[in-house]
Amino acid sequence: MKETDNLQQKIVSLCKRRGFVYPGSEIYGGLANTYDYGPLGVLMMRNIQNLWWENFITKRSDIYGLDTAVFMSPDVWVASGHTTSFNEVLIDCKNCKQRTGAEKLIEAFFESKDEKFSAEGRSLDEMEEIVQSNKIPCPECGKTDWTKPRKFSNLFETQIGIVPENKSLNYLRGELAQGMFVNFKNVLDSQRPKLPFGLGQIGKVFRNEITKGNFVFRTLEFTLMEFEYFFNPNVQKWEDIFEYWRKEMFDWITSMGVPKEKLRWRVHSDEERAHYSKRTEDLDFEFAVGFKEMFGLAYRTDFDLNKHIEKSGADLRYMDPETGEKFVPHVIEPTFGSSRIFLALLTNGYKEEGDRVVLKLDKKVAPYRVAVFPLVKNKEDIV
């Protein structure tokens, strides 16, 4: 067993044993990629989210908080491009019928050979060639007989309505951003903000992804903390704002005790970048399984607002109060995954001192800041 795998298993065991995280629906055999947060996990997650809200919303006069609905008009997702571009490439083993994410399958194969390889952004034909030429085995049965890679939507579909024949298609939101974009005009009309300003929120999102063995790193539902920062591209350079938030994100996570040497920025390639982004960078943390994304920072330009103007017919332009000029602002988007911060802090804080397991957490995020224990003579680890 690799040392990294061993550390991951120790963290998973600690989380269940001490009431941080439990497997979802465990008494019924569980449901893959779902987890429930226990008493200590809830306290720690609340601390993380409260710290984020205080730092990026409460203490600032230029960012306004929102709490938008999980369900929105399906036209929102059509306009944003998610119904056509928010996909995952999957591949099936013909022998055992196991369905696997093609990108993750390829990357895990090369990682097992201690080779770095990114499959993101590869075409379906390229991924098929990589799987076949390397004879990549199925992680379940070991066979190398695969179907062709195919694209599947990451949006969870659902039906709204009581009468079966009148039910209509809808989606669970796949990101927080669209709820903020469609409320842009409401905030302009009610708050009269001046550029640059942001709209931020904390909320659950849902992604129909095929994952396995990643604990809370990648799940079917998770909580994001995110804001859209609007600015006039004719007045401010996007590079300057991008760099500003890049530093703010880095400084915030290191303020919670995460060492700088366990963090690195990684730029998305043109093939990897999302359909709405001109530039995306991930702040990676060195998890037990290696460096993986913890935060994301994207320059979404005016893509989303323009798409919603085109689809809805609403006027989502900003009018400069001094010049009277109307224009569509550009957007920089910092995104924070609370469950990944949670896992990063546990990974960084996990220590073994002899036979004792110690979790060294910054007091700002620790579930308990002070604990009083009785003196029990037969409990040497306490006495």
Positions of PLM-derived features:
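NTP/phosphate- and nucleic-acid-binding module
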Residues: 1-383
